[in-house]
Amino acid sequence: MGRDTIADIITSIRNVDMDRKVTVRIASTNITENIVKILLREGFIENVRKHQESNKYFLVLTLRHRRNRKGTYRTILNLKRISRPGLRIYSNYQRIPRILGGMGIVILSTSRGIMTDREARLERIGGEILCYIW
């Protein structure tokens, strides 16, 4: 049985975010690097470093926590894995769901790489729905 690396990084980020820690270390693959680039571009992550440890590469993510008078609160509220190895979910560009009326993002795997729902609608291509972030 294979590992679901996307579910692993989603779970790692969710656990660290709920624990109110700042950094998380995840395994580095092409898919995880592309998803992390999207999270960095959308403002959910402050910083990304690539770390090597005995011929294995890891990504060290610094999560963004906002501050107010009462203390810190989380930026990422929910991450949900949609398409999984046992049940793949595909969508064309017209039927890509809108999360919270466009406030959240959908990460898709398309023929042109991993992108957000807005980019996929602009390029008029569909693909596999990997996860929701809102």
From Swiss-Prot:
Superkingdom, taxonomy of origin: Eukaryota
Presence of the UniProt keyword Chloroplast in the record: yes
Keywords from the named record: Chloroplast, Plastid, Ribonucleoprotein, Ribosomal protein, RNA-binding, rRNA-binding
Entry-linked PROSITE patterns: RIBOSOMAL_S8
GO cellular component, one term: ribonucleoprotein complex
Pfam families according to UniProt: Ribosomal_S8
Intracellular or extracellular location(s): Plastid, Chloroplast
rRNA-binding is among the record's keywords: yes
A single BP term in Gene Ontology: translation
Gene Ontology MF: a single term: rRNA binding
Family: Belongs to the universal ribosomal protein uS8 family.
Assembly description: Part of the 30S ribosomal subunit.
Function: One of the primary rRNA binding proteins, it binds directly to 16S rRNA central domain where it helps coordinate assembly of the platform of the 30S subunit.
Protein name: Small ribosomal subunit protein uS8c
Organism expressing this protein natively: Vitis vinifera (Grape)
